[in-house]
Design a protein with these regions (language model features):
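Secreted/periplasmic carbohydrate-active enzymes, especially glycoside hydrolases
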Residues: 1-2, 31
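Formylglycine-dependent sulfatase
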Residues: 24, 29-369
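Sec-dependent N-terminal signal peptides
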Residues: 17-25
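Bacterial N-terminal signal peptides that target proteins for export
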Residues: 4-17
């Protein structure tokens, strides 16, 4: 599947080339000793790597979209290097992310297909990852947003206790993640190995084979849905939306779909501000424009392309917020900002949300259709 591009914001081009040779060290998910952190007096460039979700080459105005405008992402393209012929390692989420972080072809490894929400950690903790390379070079490392690479041991995570292994076992100093995808249970955030806001008196149970608890499902109670499914996505209902998989418990920890982008941005801003005096690497996976597409009210109805267009606007806002944060902290000129997508566009991916009907001449595939 064709990926749309990488756009790199840089005021000093040599920073890009000084960074890239480090990535040439990737030879696959080898089991190698973790090296000691390299100390240096030189100020290393901060690196922010944005992995958007299911975004197409033709979804951005800097790539010719005329039905929607993405000014903040366009600004990145104008200031940096805009790739016109880049490719994703895989056409789906989990294997694409696995390859990015490990440098390994996912089809050579077991369990790298699309992960369930209760899958164990897919990346071996002995593997040297991209995060390890940054950490060894003296960076503070963070993973925020969509994860979808499994958590916990071979039998999956303990949602009610310490969740390990986690991103913090493969090179990240800090994590605040969506365990899988926003259409899969559990619909909770995990921060530094613990479910956020979990009430121990209301433990979480998750199953992908059979129903657990008595929470309604899309199949049994379609009248409770605010967004109906076109195929699948009819298991446990969370926030009026049928999900893949079953869960019960953890009511105080459940996310609100309309607020996910704001939450991710808030956590990213806090990480950047906290580490403004240190070189940092931030890996940020957005939930946009993956299903279910539930934009914040600020963006609902603001595009001419229905909810899929609305969440593209929300994604562009996300990038703008991060750019503004870098500018306000005075570190934009020393930050590499890389923006790409995990794979190409998906239009109808399980919900009746009008995405196909509201294209109005918009072509997410762009020139690759």
């Amino acid at each position: 599947m064709v990926n749309f591009k990488n756009t790199i914001r840089m005021n000093h081009p040599y920073l890009l080339w000084s960074l890239l040779p480090g990535f040439s060290l990737f030879t696959g998910c080898t089991v190698s000793p973790k090296k000691e952190v390299i100390k240096s007096d030189d100020r290393l460039p901060n690196v922010i790597y944005i992995f958007s979700d299911d975004l197409g080459f033709g979804d951005l105005s800097c790539y010719g979209a005329t039905k929607i405008q993405t000014p903040h992402i366009d600004s990145l393209a104008a200031q940096g290097a805009q790739f016109m012929n880049a490719y994703a390692s895989s056409a789906t989420s989990t294997p694409s992310r696995f390859c990015l972080l490990t440098g390994a072809y996912p089809w050579l490894y077991e369990n790298t297909e699309i992960a369930t929400g209760n899958a164990g950690m897919i990346i071996d903790t002995a593997c040297v990852t991209m995060a390890d390379l940054f950490k060894n070079a003296g960076y503070v490392t963070g993973a925020i947003g969509k994860w979808h690479l499994g958590l916990g041991g071979p039998n999956g995570p303990d949602w009610n206790g310490e969740i390990t292994p986690s991103p913090r076992n493969i090179g990240f100093d800090y994590d605040f993640v969506i365990p899988a995808t926003v259409d899969r249970v559990p619909c909770v955030y995990v921060e530094n190995d613990r479910v956020v806001n979990l009430d121990p008196k209301d433990p979480i149970f998750v199953d992908y084979n059979k129903k657990v608890g008595n929470w309604p499902t899309g199949k049994e109670n379609p009248e409770l849905l605010k967004m109906k499914s076109s195929h699948g996505h009819d298991n446990t209902i969370i926030n009026g939306i049928g999900r893949i998989g079953y869960m019960t418990g953890g009511k105080s920890a459940l996310w609100v779909d309309e607020d996910i982008a704001d939450t991710i941005v808030s956590k990213a801003k806090a990480f950047i501000a906290k580490n403004k005096e240190n070189p940092f690497f931030l890996y940020l996976g957005t939930q946009d424009v993956h299903v279910p597409r539930i934009p914040h009210p600020r963006f609902a109805g603001k595009s001419d392309l229905g909810v899929r267009g609305d969440v593209i606007l929300q994604l562009d806002w996300t990038i703008g917020q991060l750019m503004h944060t870098l500018d306000s902290l005075g570190i934009a000129n020393n930050t590499l900002f890389i923006f790409t997508s995990d794979n190409g566009p998906v239009i109808d991916d399980g919900y009746i949300d009008g995405a196909l009907e509201n294209l109005n001449g918009h072509t997410p595939m762009g020139i690759y259709r």
